[in-house]
Structure formats: C-alpha cells, structure tokens
Amino acid sequence: MPVDKQAKRKKSISSNEVELLYTKSKTYLHPTTSKKDNIPGYLSLSRGANAANRDIIISFMSEKQLSSEELKAYENVDIADLQDDLEALKLGGTNSRSSGKRNLNIVSKPPTSSAFGFCFSIPISFVYSIQVRKPSVGWWFGSIIINTQDGEKLPIVFFHDDESPSTLKNQKVRNQRFDPFGDNGEMYWGGSDFMNALGKFADVQKSSVEPSVYLINPESNDLRNFAPFKEPKTAKTETNQEPFKLPDVNKFFANAKWKVLETVATFSAKTRNQVLDLVDENAPMPIKQIINKPEVQKIGNEFDSARVYLAKWAAQVKEEAEEAHRKYQLDDEIYNKINKELGVGSNTEILTDEEVSKTSRRKPISKVEWEGLFDFSGRLIISIDEIKDRIFHGGLEDCIRGEAWLFLLNVYPWDSSAEERKTLRNSFQTAYEEIKLKWVNDDDKRSVDFWKDQKHRIEKDINRTDRNLSIFQNKKKISISGVGSDRLPTTRESSPETPDEADDDEFDVSNITNPHLFKMREILLTYNEHNVNLGYVQGMTDLLSPLYVTFQDESLTFWAFVNFMDRMERNFLRDQSGMKNQMLTLNELVQFMLPDLFKHLEKCESTDLYFFFRMLLVWFKREFEWSSVLSLWEILWTDYYSGQFHLFFALAVLSDNERIIRQNLSRFDEVLKYMNDLSMNMNLNHLLIRAELLFLRFRRMIDIIDRENSLKKLNNPGVYDDANNSLIKISPALRELLSKKPVIQKETERPEGVGGG
C-alpha cells in the first residue's frame, strides 16, 4: 500500500475501527436443528488502519450485536454496487472511486468471539481453506466452512438467499439479462458473491482433489498436498533398454517433425557469406566441409558470432569434450549402481510420486497473490526462497512483471520497503541521466570512428528488433535524427512495418522514428558508456527488448539491463571463451546424463552441439513465442536450483527428442536441421518439468558418486585417493552446476584500435 494512502486511512480510521469492504446480509448460524434457534447476521470483509490485504478481517456479526448506525452501514454496503467498489478497493486499499467522492463505511472492529458463540472474526492470513457447499437437493441453503491455520472450528455460515436483499437484487438483474449463472458458469447463489469478493484481496485456489475446497493464499506445499500425484507415462518395455529415459512429454510433435527431414539430403549449394570467406582460410578441414551447409548458414546469418565460433572454437570444443570424456568417464559399474539406486531397470520409477508432483507447473502469480506477499509497509512477508519457488514453478502474470522483474534482476532488494524502493527509483533516474550525458554532451567522443561504428551497429539491429510487436512497428525514415532522447525525429505516417533486412541499405538506419525503438537506442548507447570494455555486440537487442516492453521506462530498463548483462556478458566476449565454456559444460552434461545419445551424436559428428549456440546466446529468445520467452526468463532469473539452469533446459530439449535423433538421424546436417526446426514448436511447460527432473536426477547422481568415493576412502585408507586417480571423478564444470550463483565473466580491457562487436 502506498505511504500517502496509508496516511489518509490512518486519519480516517482509529485502531478500534474498521472500514467495511463487503457485507452479505441474511447469512445465518444454525446452532441447533430447530429453525427458531437460527441466528441472522452479516458476513463481512473489513480493513483496519495500516492493514495489508492479508490483514483484512473475515467476520460474522449477528444483527442483534449491531447498533442502529452500524446496522445502517452494513445494509448500505450490502446493497451497494459491489463490482465498482471492489475494483476501486482491491489495489492496495484505496478508499475511493475514481471520482474520489466515495464515503467510508466505518464501524467498530468486530470482536474475535462472543460469550455465546454468535460471532467470529479472523484475518485472511489465518485462514487455511474454505469449503463451499452450494445449494442442492438436501441442502436448501448453501453454506461455507472456514478452516483456520491452527485447526480452530468456526461456526458454519448459511446463506438464506431468499431473504438477502443483495442476492435477490443480483439474481433479478441476471434474470433480466437471461444469465442466471455466476462468473464461473455455475448457478448463482449468495456464496458466489462472497468468494468473488474474497478473491479481490486473496489468492483463492480451487483444490484439484476436492472441488468444494478452496485454498486461501496457499504455499507451494499446500497446493501439492491438495493435488493428485501425476503418473508419468513410461513404457515398461523400454525401461531396461533406455535406462536414462525420463517420462516422455510431447512426443507427438517429434514424430510429426520427422517428415520434414525426408528432404534433408536435397540441400542445394549456396554462395558463402563474406564473413565465412574471411574465416574459411584458417578454419580446420572438418569445419570447411560443413561451413557451407544451409543449416549452418541459417544460424550464421542471424549472429556473426555464430560463424566465428564455428570456425574458431567448434573443433576445439570437440577435442576438449573427448578429453573430458576420457578423464571423467564413468565406468559401467558406477552407472549400474546409479541405475539400481534410482530405480532404473526395475519395477520402480526413477523418481517418487511426490518428487514428480513437486515439479508440476502452477498458475502464474496473479496481482492479488503478489500484493498479498507484502505487508502494509511494502516488505516481503515470506522468505526469498519461498517466493523464488513460487515463481520458478508458476511464473508471473504479465500485469505484475513490471514490479516483480525489478526484484528478480536485483534492481530492488528483496528485503526493501515501498518507501526505500521509491528512494532507489529516484536515484536510478539521476544516475542514468549522468551516464547518458557523458556521450550526449561530448561532441568529440561522438566523432570518433569507434563510437560511430558502435552507434551504427546498434541502430542497424534496433531496426530489426521484434518487428512483429505493435510497440516496435516502425514508420518510414525521412528526416535527421536527434542525438539525445529530448527531441524525436520528424515523422510522417507510412507503413507500420519495419523495413526488411534486405532494405537496410536503402534508408538511413540512424533515423529511428518509432519512439520506443528510439529509447532502446538511447539505452544501448548509454550502456556502451557504462561498460566501455564490452561495447555493443549483436544479440544484445534481443536481451533488451523484453525488458523495455515490460517496463517502458528508460532508466529502469537501463538498470535492469545492466544487471541482466552481468550474467550474460560472458556470451558476448571478444574471444568467445564464455560461449565456449558453456558449450563445453553442456557437452559434459550430455555425456554424463544422456550417454547413449552422446554416443549417437559422435557418430553424427554433432558433439560440438553447434545447434545450441543461438539458444544459449540469447536464452532461447528465437525458439519460443514472446509470452513463453518472458516466462522462461523469469524462471531462469530465480536461480532456484542452479545459476546455470539454462543448461538443464537445453539438456531437456535434447532429452525430449532423444528417441527421434537416435532412431532416424545419422548425419551432422540432419541433426542440425532437425534441431533448428524445433524453433516455435516446443512446449515450454513440458520442457521445464523435464529440465527440473533432469536436475534432480543429476544432483542425486553426484550424491551417489560422492558417497561411493567416501566409502572407498573409509574402507581402504591410503589405497583410494585423489593422487592415484582411483576415485570416481566429476569435472569442476559439472560440480559448478550445483551452485545457485550465476557465472560472471567480464570482458578484458579493449585493446587500442580494436572495434566493437
């Protein structure tokens, strides 16, 4: 809740008062089976001063307990236009409609209980679940049962819909609209109003085990406990033959994709790219033989660095991978032990039902759920691990990404308050403007060839950025552009389409008329000033655009991009050592986790895993639809399991397509084409589940090996040790995958005369 709104509320409401947010009249307690003993009252939601959504009170007050003034307030709220009021109230506790004229309905704070049990009140944070019993045959009145966190038994609340003015009014309106159903498509009744109102202030999740039970602000374990175990579909006949197979997910796609490969051998030769001409002279012979293949050129045409990598590093990655294979190869004995312990090759599953259930995907965090995670001062009320668990397994709704991403990208500390974040926001704006002025006000700097080259690279890529998004659809370039962001170029209405790449030389790429692309250019030029050693490299626009679209604020986007680039900088180093190290680690991971597939890739001469270069470079930005990319990135930013979880996601892509590759592909170009064609045809959630299962298996395999080494040392001291190479070895690169810290690798100082990119 914003601080200024808290102050206004504090002036209006004392500590012994609450504001009524919702009431439902003619709700009853049935203390006995006799109708004459029924107790009529009001079921309500109310908020005290400085109360966050989790502190909102659910209460039942009997009519006899209310004064005449309070009774009038309860009646007014009951028959008010609930939908409009709740829309105005749900965001942080604002007390007015857009006009600011709404009167507060202030009443005395409900007591916790009465001597006769005729009332109760409980904060939302104390409610574990609510069982909703709709009116039906045998249950003339619908009712709700509130289950508390500590198991306290509260009276059952019955809804006498035939007496309630608000229910009768709403039912009449629905009948006039010929729509007697509630928002969820079920028959309307009074309890629907209460649950809808509660959903404005709390995360209400329907249990998949018992449909009548709704969990209130559930934690991850609550949802798992109320979800059925998932039974992976695995063919028993393949278990012994395929010991490293995870449960198949989305295989129907891979089967269909094979038809595309029937024409793979009919590729026609194409003219080599100029960049390939330059590197071809020094490329190893095996590379020269594949450098002209269309699928290689397809990747190379997108990123110049991909061509350089292929010519300079691909062969070395193969050689080092082979060396690692010899040095760290696990023998059959340890693999058999691992398989036996993990249940592979027997009648048991690789992972338990509980472990598989924990990997299930959840709904994205909604705005209501997100707001419920903070107290009245804006501080997180759950642990960082808990919120990262929730984001990892569900992601975020788009409406809260603009706030949540600032935490994930370490722009805002997780333990900060709303007031502290406001102060930080102002300091970020000032700091950004100071860095930007270093190039805006320096005519000499802008006249240097290096700066001009960087600017041209940025502008050329900016004009190609996510042209399918309406926010980036460009206008025709016709006039001279400004230097800073104060003054946009003159524009005229024209085709909204961004020019095709083939037309790049037909217009002035520096004349960026789209205001959003213009701001992105300013951000990248300012980042160039901030990180002078790295400079601009092709592919950075792919990383920047999702951030800008989410924040649409120049300074916030800049600092989010700075922090994102801290972990991504190794992808853009001049010597490409960062990409080489990742490809080598992925290679070792495939050997370790999918040994049979790796052996097949050796036969296909594909162990350099070149088809993953683009995927790793820009974190699968070209492999998924826009919304899926946003979901994937926020999940990777959590570092929930590993600071390099993107490598397990890449491993999941291979694992998901292992059968097709092993059974049908036998050449480098076939494998490359097949993997390239997976773009825009993969199921994100299925791959995330598979990646998580692969990581859990990887971690258990490491544990088993470490335990075996410890037992050898314990039982035979002096015989087994690291010096005589008698212990089972795991490479440092694989062990580093267990760390939750992202790998940071910075560019060295730029040598004089060396250009950017």
From Swiss-Prot:
Q: Which UniProt keywords apply?
A: GTPase activation
Top-level lineage group: Eukaryota
Q: From the Swiss-Prot or TrEMBL record, what is one GO molecular function term?
A: GTPase activator activity
Give GO cellular component annotations, separated by semicolons.
late endosome
Q: Which Pfam families match?
A: RabGAP-TBC (PF00566)
- Function of the protein: Most effectively accelerate the intrinsic GTPase activity of YPT7. It is also active, but to a lesser extent, on YPT31, YPT32 and YPT1. YPT6 and SEC4.
Which residue stretches does the UniProt record annotate as biased composition, category Acidic residues?
498-507
Task: Locate the region Disordered.
Answer: 482-507
What PANTHER family is this protein classified in? Answer: SMALL G PROTEIN SIGNALING MODULATOR 2-RELATED, TBC1 DOMAIN FAMILY MEMBER GTPASE-ACTIVATING PROTEIN
Protein name, entry field = GTPase-activating protein GYP7
Rab-GAP TBC domain residues: 395-640
Which BP terms in the Gene Ontology apply to this protein? regulation of vacuole fusion, non-autophagic; vesicle-mediated transport
Gene3D superfamilies under this entry?
putative rabgap domain of human tbc1 domain family member 14 like domains, Ypt/Rab-GAP domain of gyp1p, domain 3
Does the keyword field hold Nucleotidyltransferase? Answer: no
